[in-house]
């Protein structure tokens, strides 16, 4: 079976003529041409928005509602996914995207992702890791696990080979399975500007033609790309950048590698060759509706249900941003000596259970424990701070009864790499090294926070609402040159907690 999908946008005096020609062609291809004519005449939205404006299939919705009852605690997600599955077009049903569905129905993203993950365990969904083309963002390769991901991939639509080196280029999606499965269908590239969110502007220019264009770039980073020659230039939006961008000698432009431009920039474009040129501005900013590999791997629900899934040995993915919490029991050697091995070991195990409970409550995940130290990840700085404060509150309360030792905590955020270590997902990089060294500076009466994390506006807003004080400190961290600024957060008072049973 072969299916072609096309969208035509006509403007100016030629629109009426072409419409009349198409209407005559309905004798040969009546259904196809009729739909094409309707699309040309229609001013209705296209893509996802148009798909969700359709009337739900009542029978399909009832079938989905009945099957999804196996996931009883997720009442809101059951209703939303049943509605989505009964009205979305075939193209969107081939890749169920949890964040896209959650945003449309105004549901919590992580709960919706947990719903799909739980559903795979009972056979309602199948899970796919999609490798996305950096140009058109289409899913070019799929695998059932992170371990099966291929590093080198080819996109036929864009005519490029690319390597998977960033976690943002790997997205988790799902398909209905079992009794509610749908027939598989090929996914075609739909890389025209009106339906591909990454394409900001795409423009043709005839041989020896000149054009002056006023562009508005609302994002942070873009790639200027020639459809024949590929990548030309990386553009960074900066108010101090160029107000005019001259595009004439493409090879010379490519050698500049990166240029800063203003958000409102004038492009002076001249095609000096004998062939048509097509230039495209691709937005390189992260896509916030994609459940990317770095986000999913940091969630407690994924680590709990798919604890054995990790990248293949030797493969690594760059992670743009994660928040790390490091903790360590103060004086653990003395603890074992005073309490004895058996009692001290039980205390440490109880400590891990406490940490797991409070970290998971804020959608964080424990990556690993080393001795009595804990390394945990969060997607959000405020969630990490909330967990750290709750942990310290608990220890402050129980240390007064001499039932728990002191605990040191440090927080830092930034980029890192995701790797396979001993068949489990792990992280490495300078961000983690700094967090580890900050833990050396912590005491059991404070929470050490890196200067970069502390200065974030959302962190400042969060801290202003907490009953804590802070002091600034500067030290040379072991293994790093120069002093680094960090902050010591201290609880003003201990609040009664009932955080774990």
Region roles according to the model:
Residues 309, 313-387, 394:
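Catalytic NTP-binding/metal-coordinating core of nucleotidyl cyclase/transferase enzymes
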